Amino acid sequence: MPSIFTRIINGELPGHFVWKDSEVVAFMTIQPIREGHVLLIPRAEIDHWDHVPEATAQHLMRVAQRITRAIKAAWHPARVGLIVAGFEVPHAHLHLIPAEEMADLSFARAKASSAEELAAAATTLRAALRAQGEAAADW
């Protein structure tokens, strides 16, 4: 059975995408810790982070840096935290989380957001990515 992320990638479930290329996608998480919280995911359904092919892992990190710059431009956080947890969904993924302090990286702070809130955040982030010249934010 495909993971929930694969189902989002395939369009079977809704997702508020901010990045799509041949290897990875990024979309807003439905339970953000803070506004601008993004999930960055390889298209290939791989459970464990350490099983992701090296070239894909390198690409994930390059894209993570680009999205981080856009998050900083859009929301002006002190930092953008990057977390690889891997417990809730058996599909490797990175969390990019705008943060003002270490406590902002606690999943205990996650709260469900409305579709409208997620769409607005995605629109803001795509605009910041486009301002950086990132074509992968357009599809």
Segments predicted by a language model, with ranges:
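HIT superfamily nucleotide-processing domains
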Residues: M1-W139
